[in-house]
Amino acid sequence: MFKRIALVCALFSGVCFAEGKQLLDKVVAIVNDNVITSSELNAQVELSKKQIIAQNMQMPDESVLRKQVLQHLIDVDLEMQMAKQNGITIENAEIDEAIEKIAASNHLNLSQMRDEITKQGISWQEYRQNIRKEMLISRVQQKAVGKDIIVTNEQVEQYLKTSGRIENSNLTYHLKNIVIPLSEEPTTKQLQRAKIEAENLLNKIKKGEDFSRLAIEESSGEFALEGGDLGERHLAELPEVFAKEVVHMKVGQVAGPIRAGNGFHLIKLVAVGGENQRHVITQTHVRHILLKPDASMVPSEAIKQVNNIYRQIQSGKDFALMAKQYSLDAASAVKGGDLGWVNPGELVPEFEKTMNSLPLHKVSKPVKTQYGWHLIEVIARRQKDDSEAFKKQQVRQFLQQRKFVEAVQNWQQHLRSQAYINIVDKDLA
């Protein structure tokens, strides 16, 4: 640490020269033991400008944009430091898998994906590094607060009772927001100052100033550099203080200031989407015979026996009788191997994939899963309207996401309060 600080002190003058009078990178901020350099800031500013242009937003003043980008880099650096302290790493194979999913979601192969990234002026190596950072930050956030995110059945029912009827749970709200930050324990004076600042911004918006540009210039929120765009969120995903407001807002309306844990917010309702849809699932009535290696049966014997049972069934032996005689799944064996009606996702993937591909009353060849070797027969299929259970599960997921976002914001606020942050370039302070 002392060596790093000594180096930083040598750079405080702003311009230093190496051997041969080569201009060195200027330090613009110190974050604990790390530094953020001018070149890092410049690169992120240029990237932000491209994003602002691509989204057809008004370009903010250069000096204001640089300040906002620096604050973003400080937040990222703090979370990357936490990832390092916790020994969190991302393997190259994980990055490859993530990029493949991104490409597939955009209907591109990897070659086309690489071309698109290059067209945006980003090298493939830079893109991979950005993906690595995003994954590291996601993982460290999950480690920091994920274990504390619990949503009970009672909370789901209470939400549906008081905030969102089941038939409306599919609606989405496209929001933008501006955050005027507060410390963890603000004084009365700090509260008043932040509220006045938020009210002044609201007045500017009412007079016609662009919400997105003001978000880029003034907001401390995670999405400030995207014009404060939160995207489309279901009601249960929104902070409760937002949800109470948004259901009464008209498209285009701006509400606030709204007091939340991390500051005062202004929110703009951009659009309302989604519609009430029925959710229908295919249930499968299935039975199986399970053989698995154990102390009395080595793997080769289990494979030999399951193949022998398969041949006997193919020759006309009764499946239920064979299950009662040979299956090692005690719970279903007494019922002739019958597992009853199962929903999608209830069985292990290898079993379900084979089951879904089988015609009715046809017995599968032996299928290997973590439990052993299975013979599978589909007895019947039916369609079931699962809308109520599905939407309750959606609400549970949305409430989990709401709690997670709020917990992450509090954690980020705490990280900042505990960190040593020195903005060396006073033009950026």
Curated annotation (Swiss-Prot):
It catalyses: [protein]-peptidylproline (omega=180) = [protein]-peptidylproline (omega=0). GO terms for molecular function: peptide binding; peptidyl-prolyl cis-trans isomerase activity; unfolded protein binding. It is found in: Periplasm. One of its GO terms (biological process) is protein folding. InterPro entries: OMP_Chaperone_SurA, PPIase_dom_sf, PPIase_PpiC, PPIase_SurA, SurA_N, Trigger_fact/SurA_dom_sf. It comes from the Bacteria. Its EC number is 5.2.1.8. Coiled coil: none annotated. PROSITE patterns: PPIC_PPIASE_2 (PS50198). Residues 170-271, 281-380 form the PpiC domain. GO terms for cellular component: outer membrane-bounded periplasmic space. Keywords: Chaperone, Isomerase, Periplasm, Repeat, Rotamase, Signal. Residues 1-18 form the signal peptide. The PPIase activity resides only in the second parvulin domain. The N-terminal region and the C-terminal tail are necessary and sufficient for the chaperone activity of SurA. The PPIase activity is dispensable for SurA to function as a chaperone. The N-terminal region and the C-terminal tail are also required for porin recognition. HAMAP family: Chaperone_SurA (MF_01183). Chaperone involved in the correct folding and assembly of outer membrane proteins. Recognizes specific patterns of aromatic residues and the orientation of their side chains, which are found more frequently in integral outer membrane proteins. May act in both early periplasmic and late outer membrane-associated steps of protein maturation. This is Chaperone SurA. It comes from Legionella pneumophila subsp. pneumophila (strain Philadelphia 1 / ATCC 33152 / DSM 7513).
